[in-house]
């Protein structure tokens, strides 16, 4: 097996290399959704707004170029029951280039309904303005 060591990679004409099929996250957030919401870590989030039980709004520092960006959602909670996190918030608001809403709710439990998870994770992919 060979090992390649390099400080700089350039095209054959000496210019920068074009990276193709790159899809780095343009936004992410890890926050505590219980009590007073608190951001643990983030990229490109200006503010997090608690809109009510299980309902949150993410405002971006730099807008996305259009509303065709992709979002991934996740959560972790110590209680029983399955918790789902979806886009749109409780009022099913459409995302804009500058913000999106999410909602968390519990299924398959005697406490079914909107819920504030202890850990909420959101990642966004797309072009920025």
Positions of PLM-derived features:
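Extracellular jelly-roll beta-sandwich "head" domains, especially the C-terminal globular C1q domain
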Residues: 75-129
């Amino acid at each position: 097996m060979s090992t390649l060591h390099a400080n700089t990679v350039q095209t054959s004409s000496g210019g920068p290399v074009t990276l193709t099929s790159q899809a780095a996250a343009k936004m992410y957030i890890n926050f505590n959704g219980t009590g007073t919401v608190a951001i643990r870590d983030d990229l490109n989030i200006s503010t997090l707004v608690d809109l009510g039980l299980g309902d949150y709004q993410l405002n971006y520092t730099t807008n996305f170029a259009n509303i065709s960006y992709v979002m991934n959602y996740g959560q972790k909670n110590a209680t029983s029951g399955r918790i789902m996190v979806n886009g749109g918030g409780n009022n099913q608001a459409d995302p804009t280039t500058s913000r999106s809403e999410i909602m968390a709710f519990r299924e398959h439990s005697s406490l079914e309904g909107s819920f504030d998870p202890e850990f909420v994770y959101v990642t966004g992919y797309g072009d920025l303005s």
